[in-house]
Curated annotation (Swiss-Prot):
Protein name, per record: Hydrogenase maturation factor HypA
Lineage: Bacteria, Pseudomonadati, Chlorobiota, Chlorobiia, Chlorobiales
Species: Pelodictyon phaeoclathratiforme (strain DSM 5477 / BU-1)
Protein function: Involved in the maturation of [NiFe] hydrogenases. Required for nickel insertion into the metal center of the hydrogenase.
HAMAP family: HypA_HybF
One GO BP: protein maturation
PROSITE patterns, per database record: HYPA
Signal peptide: none
Length: 117
């Protein structure tokens, strides 16, 4: 389950940034995880809840946006939705398809609370 190592990395990154900013608690974390990134969002949420225990992120709400996969044909230039890494262009049937969206994985933002909030 690689989601646990990903969850631990997220916790490390957000806690370090929150401390740098003088935060005492993280209330929300917004992630962008493309549907082709190979990460199961529900597993990540489960692992995150375990990884965040006893940290500034222990009560953080994990919001995950999942952009669809998009491919672009290297022959005719058509862009189209893809669900797998290997796709055929629906227009010209070429297999020269480049994935242009759906592999993203990043921490978009987080909400840090300061003392007294």
């Amino acid at each position: 389950m690689h989601e646990m190592s990903i969850a631990l990395s997220i916790v490390d990154a957000v806690v370090a940034k929150a401390r740098q900013e003088g935060g005492v608690r993280i209330s929300a974390i917004d992630l962008l995880i493309g549907k082709l990134a190979g990460i199961e969002p529900e597993s990540l949420k489960f692992c995150f809840s375990a990884a965040a225990r006893e940290t500034l992120a222990a009560e953080a709400l994990l919001n995950i946006e999942e952009p669809e996969g998009v491919g672009e044909c290297g022959e005719c230039g058509m862009s189209f939705p893809v669900n797998f890494y290997y796709a055929e262009c629906p227009r010209c049937r070429s297999l020269r398809v480049k994935i242009v969206s759906g592999e993203e994985f990043l921490i978009q933002s987080m909400t840090i609370e300061e003392e007294g909030e």
